[in-house]
Amino acid sequence: MIEVTEWDLKALFRSEEQLERFMSSLKRNARQFAKAYEGKLSEIKSQDFCAVIREYEEILEGIGRVMTYVFLGFAKDSTQGDVYAKYEMQTTQIHNLVLFFELEFCKLSQNQQKECIESSPQYAYFLQKLIEQDE
């Protein structure tokens, strides 16, 4: 007998309605982030950089939360492929809105990158990996 795994997905979202509200908020936050910082990353003072990357992290964590929820729902019921595809497309669109952050960070001067890393030590590993991947 095959044992079916049951996940309690309520830790992520209690309902589809909550998921939809979260997605709306996530899209709005990503648009605001892009409006505030796209093309302007080089102008951000190093002491303000930590707050900017924290916003970026929150958006990425939101994407991860949504995709974890829909993936586990799909794993439980593979007839839900349309739901998975819907949210995968939406989260990809959200990620595309904020992708500039990584690209622009890699284009900063080495001195600016160093200052940003020093002002955001909790993100040093992530930022250093971005630089290494860009080389």
Give, region by region, the residue ranges found by the protein language model.
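A well-structured
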Residues: M1-E135
